[in-house]
């Protein structure tokens, strides 16, 4: 107000109104100085009349003035402004608005809270409390701590207080509304250094109880001790640096307030818990760690692996525990969630493409999920709050609006250019509105009323606002348009340059029109001259960021959620979805709305014509229509579903429309605006410091000096018509004259200054002060209700925030406590929206447990949620009969695994599904069988010979003599038939004085004579004792001549003679010595063969054997019994020397040299005597053991092993011979058979694909007779690729992007509805190095509903596309639309009848074939008409890339040249590798289908793959299974290998991929051979035929680990005992590898010598590690969700979560019918068939056809073939089918196709056909219709062609 200057004595700083300062002080510098003088005395505010407030942030308190009260403080001024606004609201019925302007850190949020507190204090309803909570929730969710402030707002706020019109004195508050604008989503995942993310995330982390932390997964945080010993915090990626967890914000208290606010706003407790879970989920998403891995597990939807054999590089989550927490809270399957991070589906060139992401891409995907969830949560909470506080629109009479957008951003802290641009655009608009309010609008009013005031110059930012925000061609509109059109960032830059260059000075795009690539990269930015300074905005990534599209993958994933709350989050109106035009249920992508869900209450009301400053009716209509559309969205509560062509807005378009509404609401006639300029006193956040330079810059920026000057000239805020003015003045009839004269009299009386009161032509202009004086508003009482007033519930009112950055202790229960609300506003002892009464002053029943205990107490546990999320919705799809063989196998499985209970598998194996547990049992049973087989093999190799012929440790006389210690031999010695190790004994011989040389002379001899024995000590005789004087003279005459014997007269014998007659009698000495020697030095026994014993018997030797022991009684019988008495004694006469029983002696005498065992048993003697006689025999007459080493059983054991070895050796020899017989190479003649060359492509790179395609195109085979067919499995961009695989293939083949055929339906291999697939067919000619080859490309694109991996079904499905097509061609069966199109392209375009093709060559996309390979294979087929399949030799191209590839080189070589060559001898190669094989399509003589016969195709197309056996057949080794099917169903035909056809492929380079590949091969081998063994007609001569080959292959696969064990056993044997060398085994090994070596030597493959050595070193890997790993991981699959369960009455039912497939959904018809319709359509001059559902193209046949079916004059390599002919469709479609993919525009303003066609005919009727062009026709049409027809260009072009060709 231009109040009078303060009294002369008053200091200058006492003047609060800047316009009241003298004119010489109205400059930026002087005003800044005045603000400084006020700031330094504690008055941080000033006024610009009554319309604006200037507030300086003191960084201390906002509640204390100079005297300690609130007078003069920011809070006091805010309350004063609120009081004035409220008064005007009541007195004049005007809407009020308070607009905040200021930089970040200037205290806007704080002043806003004071202002809201003041407004709410004028009402006594409980609604005031709710509005307070609502504002707090908004701040909690959208404010953060920045470098400049603790409370930086990061979302635009339009807060509306709603009043009814029942009282003109005190309007009643009836509701409120929070309208949020554009949350800074990028902050969630990108927290700037030194700043925080949104406060609520920190509250959650700090404020939850231990029990809640455990539930939310926060308890697993690892606390790391820092160097100072303090406990550091776990680093949360989304919370910035750990130091930001402790920055003076009371997060613990904040969380309690957060929960209290939600509860007071009537959020159910379960919902509060869900909200907390979602917030925790966001934090956990930030913790996910991604890594690259190999997809070594076969996926359920795969119909077979590619050449990389499951080695596809995929992205995996490393910390699965965190992943499971996220999955539980989102109600999702862990597996689905992990997979969703690894890929992203995009729309590129109107095609849906799945991009396989690397870990970096997966991180970005996870970040997008976090941003999306948080944005949706904020939208949900705000909308839920609005539903609780908003009044019915019709009951709202007036509103007070508080508008606070984030401050101007000089830089984008989070890296988001889009957020910075939106921020600054909004600030620019609000500042422009401020200028309009002070300058332009008032000038217009004054001019209308013929009041003249001096003009004031000011900085006008209208150019910037128009440049940024103008509809249609403003910067944001252009950005949105370019996003919608799918343009690039540089194209956007070029569009901006064209629009603004030399047209708008505020937007500068540097660079010329032809900017070079270097300069584009150097400066891809544009500059905007804002009122606050110039800002450069980078365009890099701006288009994509503006799209803000949520991928369809995420929407599809969330569709499967089991959480009702998450479903509600993703089902709200804030999420707009884009559905496919042809399938409304298929969500292509979605978008979180960047505009608010609600509109200002006044926005929908048209302003009355009588209002001042009315904007035009068009604006009103526009605002109304926007309001209605948004209201419709929010009221329905459903997602707004938009078609792909419906023009869904990008973020810029939405933000622009919301700003437009804000502007028009603020600019409406019945609204009075106030402005609060918030200034920073310095840039360093230092309390009570005033930086004049900093403040002056802000004063200049906001043009405060110009505004002040304007107010000095014209401070008019109220316009009163004369009648109203005079009524208020109450002058009655005192003054006579016109109303104008009366008004002038009143003004003269009032003596108001001229800048505050002027009379116009129809009324009076007044300032707010003058109006207040006139209307006596000072007499009105504005009630202010105490903060501790209770609401109806009795709770203390949560009063709006009353302090901002001060330390007022008002309303605190305990001044010592931390003030409620201080947690969010940074400084000490602060109070926020909450008064402390409410926090803990009184607890609601049960609330204490909720606040301090566990809010999840009655909630589902995380484990329950996870289990729920992993469940799939299943439905019955089919019956599943169980075969008899399957039942028998299951019985055997249970027999082998019955001891493992089901619950144990479920508990320890964590296998919940019954069918997967059954598979585990099957796997375990198979492993048991394999292990048993290995055990049997080991038994026969090692144990069987030992059982049949036990090992004997015996030495014949000759063998004993050889151990004489000479020539390196060991030294043995024999004593009484026992052989000892003399070498070992000699070092320990006692006494030591005897030299070893003296002992060595006894080596190799029988030294029994050296050891005389005491007979009485060793034998008890017949009676139980023998006289000690009896001696036995022992002479070992039986082995004389073989080994030297030592006689008893040897000089050394006296040292061992301790018999009774000696002086030193030791009866037991010999026995003790023998016990000691046997224990330490025993080597064996002297051996006597039965033959040698017989010989000795014939020589009158009394020798025989009993139970294997040999006894010699010759010396006893021959009188060797003596007696001798000790010295001095005589021998008694009655000494009996016959101590042996006569019957025993006579036994040896009568049967010398024989086995006496049975006779011994039959002797008629008592047991005691038998025991005594046995003792005497063992101690005195034992001479050795019977040597049975050459017996019959031992010979059998030896020759049995030899026979097996010979058998194996013979197989090896046969393999060798088989390899040799294929040595001759013949060069076949030129052949004229038609062949198809098929290449399945998945995610290979361009180099691999080009190599494969080029090698097939360059094959030396007639180009006309080969057809190159490439089948692309899905729209997928592999890791490392920049385009989807189909696009790479089409680019290689030269098909332009403009060619876009219609996708057509066909059957696929998949579960449920995935059996319905769609594909595009391209054809043309490929030209390379002089070869021109016709090609057909089939791209599987999937149904519109397929969001992730569209069209992808696996390699087997790719093979089936061609097999099923050829099958239907040969059987003349009805075909699917895509097959009809294939038939049409091959027959009518390429010009070959599909039945002509006889052979199909299947090559993988990473395989290169030799130029002559096809010729050699076809020659082999022609030579043998009984041949059905032929494979060639495959070598490696990456042999030296890694150790893993090096060990495979030799193995690849021998697997072909030995194994396959051997199998080929019998015409039964059991595995024709899919990477390089040719098949016979039909028989040569009868044209009977072979490869594509009904039986083979039906069996190979098996969809129900739900058992372990079928999984291994069809998911692991589909190539081998295809061979198995050919051998089963065409048993009279042969499969062969020819070494002359060569190809080169890429082997796995990493261990994981190699392991996965071999697991597939080994397991599929086992299961396929099991399939083959029961086959009939497989036996040949002596069974040496295919069945034998199959059995040998199966056995060798199963017992592979044993072969290595055997080799190790041999090595151990050799090392252990060098004396016995197993020559047979060594010869066998030498034969195995020697013959292999001979093969490559004969073929001069010298390099194979080195590779063979490498292979031998890797033998443990191939023979042991790989088989064992493979057998145990036989059930390692992703099992999918189709399974068999037991239904009613035991019926086996197939259930699936993919839905039931309806075969009728794919229409089929025979080729003849289709061809007839095609011909009729070509001749009927009609472009549509309403009956058949076939839409036709516009090109007719060319009369001059080449041999390919092409026009002869046209360049073949550039044919635009897909536009020719017909396109099948499920319904009649418009010509060219491209209208569905047009730009997303509203086509209603365009002329109809019929109208365009009529005009085209008219133009062509009169045009010169020699000069007319399509472009000229389009221009003429645009002239005639008066509209732009760019969107109709495809139709115009095609219709023009059709008219010219006569088709229309």
From Swiss-Prot:
Key word Magnesium present: no
GO molecular function terms listed in the Swiss-Prot or TrEMBL record: actin binding; ATP binding; chitin synthase activity; cytoskeletal motor activity
Chain positions covered by the region annotation Actin-binding: 659-683
Residue stretches spanning the membrane: 889-909, 928-948, 1200-1220, 1595-1615, 1621-1641, 1648-1668
InterPro entries assigned: Chitin_synth (IPR004835), Cyt_B5-like_heme/steroid-bd (IPR001199), Cyt_B5-like_heme/steroid_sf (IPR036400), DEK_C (IPR014876), Kinesin_motor_dom_sf (IPR036961), Myosin_head_motor_dom-like (IPR001609), MYSc_Myo17 (IPR036037), Nucleotide-diphossugar_trans (IPR029044)
Keywords: Actin-binding, ATP-binding, Cell membrane, Glycoprotein, Glycosyltransferase, Membrane, Motor protein, Myosin, Nucleotide-binding, Transferase, Transmembrane, Transmembrane helix
Name of protein: Chitin synthase E
Gene (name only): chsE
């Amino acid at each position: 107000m231009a109040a009078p200057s303060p009294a002369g004595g008053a200091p200058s700083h006492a003047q609060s109104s800047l316009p009241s300062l003298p004119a010489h002080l109205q400059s930026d510098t002087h005003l800044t100085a005045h603000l400084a003088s006020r700031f330094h005395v504690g008055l941080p505010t000033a006024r610009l009349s009554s319309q604006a407030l200037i507030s300086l942030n003191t960084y201390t308190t906002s509640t204390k003035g100079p005297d300690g009260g609130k007078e003069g403080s920011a809070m006091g001024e805010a309350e004063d402004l609120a009081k004035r606004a409220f008064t005007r609201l009541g007195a004049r019925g005007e809407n009020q608005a308070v607009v905040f302007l200021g930089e970040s850190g200037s205290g806007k949020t704080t002043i806003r809270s004071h202002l809201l507190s003041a407004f709410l204090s004028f009402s006594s309803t409980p609604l005031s409390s709710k509005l307070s909570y609502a504002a707090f929730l908004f701040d909690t969710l959208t404010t953060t701590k920045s470098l400049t402030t603790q409370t930086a707002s990061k979302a635009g706020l339009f807060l509306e207080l709603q009043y009814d019109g029942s009282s003109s004195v005190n309007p009643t508050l009836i509701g409120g509304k929070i309208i949020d604008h554009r949350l800074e989503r990028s902050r969630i995942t990108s927290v700037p250094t030194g700043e925080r993310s949104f406060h609520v995330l920190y509250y959650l982390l700090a404020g939850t109880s231990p029990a809640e932390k455990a539930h939310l997964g926060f308890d697993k945080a690892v606390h790391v001790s820092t160097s100072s010993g303090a406990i550091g915090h776990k680093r949360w990626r989304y919370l910035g640096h750990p130091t930001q967890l402790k920055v003076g914000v009371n997060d613990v208290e904040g969380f309690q307030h957060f929960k209290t606010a939600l509860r007071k706003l009537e959020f159910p407790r379960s919902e509060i818990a869900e909200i907390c879970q979602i917030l925790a989920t966001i934090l956990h998403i930030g913790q996910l760690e991604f890594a690259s891995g190999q997809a070594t597990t076969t996926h359920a939807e795969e119909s077979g692996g590619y050449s990389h054999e499951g080695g596809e590089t995929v992205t995996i989550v490393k910390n699965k525990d965190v992943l499971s927490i996220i999955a539980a809270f989102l109600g999702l399957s862990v597996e689905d969630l992990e997979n969703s991070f690894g890929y992203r589906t995009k729309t590129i060139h109107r095609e849906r493409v799945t991009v396989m992401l690397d870990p970096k891409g997966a991180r970005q995907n996870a970040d997008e999920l976090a941003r999306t969830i948080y944005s949706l949560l904020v939208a949900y909470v705000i909308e839920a709050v609005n539903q609780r506080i908003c009044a019915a629109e019709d009951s709202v009479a007036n509103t007070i609006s508080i508008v606070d957008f984030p401050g101007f951003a000089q830089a984008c802290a989070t890296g988001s250019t889009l957020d910075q641009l939106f921020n600054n655009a909004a600030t620019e608009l609000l500042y422009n509105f401020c200028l309009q309010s002070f300058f332009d609008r008032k000038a217009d009013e004054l001019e209308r009323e013929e009041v003249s005031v001096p003009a004031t110059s000011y900085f006008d930012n209208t150019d910037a606002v128009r440049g940024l925000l103008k509809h249609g061609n403003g910067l944001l509109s252009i950005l949105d348009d370019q996003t919608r059109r799918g343009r690039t960032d540089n194209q956007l830059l070029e569009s901006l340059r064209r629009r603004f260059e030399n047209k708008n000075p505020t937007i500068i795009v540097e660079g010329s029109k032809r900017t070079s690539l270097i300069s584009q990269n150097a400066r891809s930015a544009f500059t905007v001259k804002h009122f606050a300074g110039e800002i450069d905005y980078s365009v890099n990534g701006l288009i994509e960021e503006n799209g803000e599209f949520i991928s369809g993958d995420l929407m599809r994933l969330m569709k499967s959620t089991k959480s009702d709350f998450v479903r509600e989050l993703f089902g709200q109106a804030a999420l707009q979805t884009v559905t496919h035009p042809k399938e409304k249920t298929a969500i292509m992508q979605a978008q979180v709305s960047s505009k608010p869900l609600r509109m200002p209450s006044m926005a929908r009301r048209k302003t009355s014509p009588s209002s001042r400053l009315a904007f035009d009716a068009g604006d009103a209509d526009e605002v109304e229509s926007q309001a209605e559309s948004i209201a419709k969205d929010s009221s329905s509560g459903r997602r707004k579903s938009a078609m792909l062509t419906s023009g869904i807005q990008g973020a810029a378009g939405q933000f622009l429309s919301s700003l437009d509404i804000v502007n028009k609401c603020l600019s409406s006639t019945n609204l009075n605006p106030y402005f609060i300029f918030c200034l920073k006193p310095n840039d360093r956040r230092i309390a009570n410091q005033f930086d004049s330079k900093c403040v002056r810059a802000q004063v200049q920026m906001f043009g405060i000096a110009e505004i002040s000057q304007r107010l000095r000239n014209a401070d008019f805020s109220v316009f009163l018509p004369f009648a109203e003015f005079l009524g208020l003045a109450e002058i009655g009839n005192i003054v006579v004259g016109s109303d104008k004269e009366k008004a002038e009299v009143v003004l003269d009386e009032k003596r108001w200054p001229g800048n505050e009161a002027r009379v116009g032509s129809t009324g009076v202009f007044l300032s707010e002060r003058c109006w207040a004086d006139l209307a006596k508003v000072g007499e009105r009482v504005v009630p202010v209700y105490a903060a501790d007033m209770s609401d109806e519930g009795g709770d203390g009112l949560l009063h709006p925030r009353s302090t901002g950055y001060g330390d007022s202790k008002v309303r605190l229960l305990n001044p010592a406590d931390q003030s409620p609300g201080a947690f969010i506003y940074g400084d000490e002892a602060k109070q926020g929206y909450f008064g402390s009464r409410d926090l803990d002053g009184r607890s609601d029943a049960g609330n204490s447990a909720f606040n301090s205990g566990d809010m999840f107490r009655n909630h589902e546990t995380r484990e329950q949620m996870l289990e729920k999320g992993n469940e799939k919705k299943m439905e019955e799809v089919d019956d599943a009969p169980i075969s008899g063989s399957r039942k028998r196998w299951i019985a055997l499985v249970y027999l082998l695994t019955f001891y493992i209970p089901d619950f144990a598998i479920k508990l320890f194996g964590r296998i919940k599904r019954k069918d997967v547990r059954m598979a585990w049992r099957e796997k375990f049973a198979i492993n048991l069988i394999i292990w048993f087989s290995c055990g049997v093999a080991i038994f026969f190799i090692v144990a069987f010979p030992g059982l049949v012929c036990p090992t004997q440790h015996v030495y014949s006389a000759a063998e004993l003599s050889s151990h004489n210690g000479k020539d390196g031999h060991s030294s043995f010695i024999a004593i009484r038939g026992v052989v000892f190790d003399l070498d070992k004994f000699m070092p320990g011989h006692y006494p030591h004085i005897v030299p070893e040389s003296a002992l060595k002379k006894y080596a190799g001899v029988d030294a029994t004579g050296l050891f005389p024995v005491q007979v009485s000590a060793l034998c008890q005789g017949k009676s139980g004792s023998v006289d000690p004087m009896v001696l036995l003279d022992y002479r070992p005459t039986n082995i004389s001549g073989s080994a030297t014997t030592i006689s008893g007269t040897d000089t050394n014998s006296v040292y061992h003679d301790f018999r009774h007659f000696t002086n030193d009698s030791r009866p037991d000495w010999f026995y003790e010595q023998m016990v000691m020697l046997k224990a330490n030095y025993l080597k064996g026994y002297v051996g006597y063969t039965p033959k040698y014993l017989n010989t000795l018997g014939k020589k009158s030797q009394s020798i025989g054997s009993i139970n294997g022991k040999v006894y010699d009684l010759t010396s006893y019988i021959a009188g060797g019994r003596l007696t001798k008495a000790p010295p001095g004694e005589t021998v008694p006469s009655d000494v009996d020397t016959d101590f042996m029983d006569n019957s025993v002696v006579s036994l040896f005498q009568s049967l010398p040299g024989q086995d006496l065992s049975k006779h011994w048993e039959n002797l008629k003697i008592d047991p005691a005597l038998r025991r005594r006689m046995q003792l005497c025999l063992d101690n005195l007459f034992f001479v050795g053991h019977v040597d049975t080493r050459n017996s019959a059983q031992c010979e059998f054991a030896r020759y049995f092993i030899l026979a097996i070895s010979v058998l194996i050796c013979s197989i090896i020899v046969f393999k060798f011979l088989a390899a040799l017989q294929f040595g001759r190479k013949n060069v076949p003649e030129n052949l004229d058979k038609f062949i198809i060359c098929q290449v399945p492509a998945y995610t290979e790179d361009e180099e691999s694909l080009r190599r494969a395609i080029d090698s097939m195109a360059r094959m030396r085979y007639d180009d006309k007779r080969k057809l190159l067919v490439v089948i692309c499995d899905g729209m997928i961009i592999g890791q490392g690729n920049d385009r989807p695989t189909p696009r790479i293939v089409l680019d290689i083949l030269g098909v332009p992007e403009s060619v876009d055929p219609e996708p057509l339906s066909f059957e696929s291999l998949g579960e449920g509805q995935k059996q319905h697939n769609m594909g595009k067919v391209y054809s043309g000619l490929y030209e390379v190095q002089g070869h021109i080859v016709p090609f057909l490309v089939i791209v599987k694109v999937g149904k519109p509903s397929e969001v992730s991996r569209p069209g992808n079904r696996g390699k087997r499905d790719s093979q089936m596309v061609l097999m099923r097509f050829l099958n239907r061609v040969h059987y003349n069966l009805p075909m699917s639309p895509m097959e009809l199109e294939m038939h049409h392209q091959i027959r009518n375009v390429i010009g070959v009848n599909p039945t002509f093709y006889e052979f199909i060559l299947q090559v993988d996309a990473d395989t290169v074939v030799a130029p002559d390979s096809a010729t050699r294979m076809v020659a082999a087929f022609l030579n043998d008409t009984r041949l059905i399949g032929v494979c060639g030799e495959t070598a490696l191209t990456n042999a030296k890339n890694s150790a893993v590839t090096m060990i495979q080189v030799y193995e690849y070589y021998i697997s072909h040249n030995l194994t396959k060559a051997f199998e080929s001898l019998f015409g039964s190669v059991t595995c024709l590798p899919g990477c390089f094989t040719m098949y016979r399509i039909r028989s040569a003589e009868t044209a009977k289908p072979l490869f594509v016969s009904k039986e083979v195709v039906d069996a190979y197309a098996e969809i129900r793959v739900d058992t372990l056996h079928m999984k291994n057949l069809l998911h692991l080794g589909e190539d081998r299974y295809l061979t198995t099917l050919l051998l089963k169903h065409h048993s009279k035909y042969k499969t062969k290998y020819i070494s002359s056809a060569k190809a080169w492929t890429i082997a796995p380079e990493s261990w994981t991929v190699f392991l996965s590949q071999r697991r597939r091969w080994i397991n599929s081998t086992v299961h396929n051979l099991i399939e083959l063994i029961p086959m009939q007609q497989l036996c040949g001569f002596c069974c040496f035929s295919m069945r034998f080959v199959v059995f040998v292959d199966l056995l060798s696969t199963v017992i592979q680990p044993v072969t290595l064990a055997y080799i190790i056993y041999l090595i151990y044997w050799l090392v252990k005992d060098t004396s016995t060398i197993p020559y047979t085994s060594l010869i066998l090994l030498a034969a195995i590898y020697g013959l292999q070596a001979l093969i490559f030597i004969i073929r001069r493959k010298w390099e194979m010598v080195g590779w063979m050595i490498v292979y031998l070193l890797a033998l443990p890997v191939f023979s042991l590690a790989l088989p064992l790993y493979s057998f145990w991981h036989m059930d390692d699959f992703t099992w999918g969700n189709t399974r068999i369960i037991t239904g009613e009455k035991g019926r086996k039912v197939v259930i699936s979560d993919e839905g039931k497939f309806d075969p009728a959904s794919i229409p089929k018809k025979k080729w003849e019918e289709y061809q007839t319709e095609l011909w009729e359509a070509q001749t009927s001059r009609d472009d549509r068939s309403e009956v058949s559902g076939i839409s036709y193209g516009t090109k007719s046949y060319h009369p001059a056809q080449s041999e390919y079916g092409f026009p002869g004059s046209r360049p073949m390599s550039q044919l635009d073939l897909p536009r020719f002919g017909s396109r099948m469709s499920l319904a009649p479609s418009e010509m060219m089918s491209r209208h569905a993919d047009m730009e997303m525009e509203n086509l209603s303003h365009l002329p109809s196709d019929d109208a365009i066609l009529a005009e085209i005919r008219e133009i062509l009727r009169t045009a010169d056909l020699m000069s007319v062009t399509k472009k000229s026709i389009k221009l003429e049409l645009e002239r005639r219709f008066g509209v732009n027809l760019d969107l109709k260009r495809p139709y115009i072009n095609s219709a023009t062609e059709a008219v010219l060709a006569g088709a229309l």
